[in-house]
């Protein structure tokens, strides 16, 4: 399970994941663990420093920039730009030869071609579609990059598919079908299959056919 926001409080015990991996310490990503966790929790040192108050027994440090294996799945924490107070990472997740990049809150992605190169799917920030929520503070980008900017990153890195999650109120309260059509169109303009992620969706990373 990646992230456990406050709306998952208590429900996480019913889900009973085998591991939880955190991107950053904002309430909508980590405060579902206010009553503890039913499994090991992985986070960067910067995130753990902000979560000292949570009664999590099995705390494991996630190194930045180095892949580790969790239950047979490789996770590589990549520093991204989103918040100064709660430094965030995105995760390059690999299973065999297939991989995806997950960053539900992101304003900027340094070294994007290297980070996204070779992935099959980009799963990004759905806070806003076209209106930027990014500004500069202390020399760092903070906030939320629009879907259009993230699609540009994917295009430049040769990523063929993109999904957007953690959607903002304008999307959640809007007409989902029409907005999804718009996202698909924005993707097609860049040669990318794109869409909005919905509750219950499943993403299958099919194995590459053998030669």
Segment roles from a protein language model:
Residues 25-31, 48-50, 66, 83-85, ...:
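Active-site environment of divalent metal-dependent phosphoester hydrolases
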């Amino acid at each position: 399970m990646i992230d456990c926001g406050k709306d998952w409080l208590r429900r996480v015990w019913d889900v009973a994941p085998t591991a939880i991996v955190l991107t950053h310490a904002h309430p909508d990503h980590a405060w579902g663990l206010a009553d503890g966790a039913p499994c090991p929790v992985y986070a960067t040192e910067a995130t753990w420093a902000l979560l000292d108050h949570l009664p999590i027994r099995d705390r494991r440090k996630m190194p930045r920039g180095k892949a580790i294996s969790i239950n047979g799945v490789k996770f590589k924490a990549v520093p991204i730009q989103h918040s100064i107070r709660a430094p965030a990472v995105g995760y390059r997740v690999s299973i065999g030869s297939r991989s995806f990049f997950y960053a539900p809150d992101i304003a900027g992605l340094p070294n994007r071609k290297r980070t996204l190169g070779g992935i099959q799917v980009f799963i990004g920030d759905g806070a806003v579609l076209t209106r930027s929520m990014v500004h500069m503070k202390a020399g760092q980008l903070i906030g939320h990059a629009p879907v259009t900017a993230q699609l540009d990153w994917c295009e430049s890195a040769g990523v063929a598919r993109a999904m957007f999650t953690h959607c903002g109120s304008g999307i959640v309260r809007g007409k989902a079908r029409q907005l999804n059509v718009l996202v698909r169109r924005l993707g097609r303009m860049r040669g990318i299959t794109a869409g909005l992620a919905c509750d219950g969706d499943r993403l299958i990373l099919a194995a590459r056919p053998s030669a």
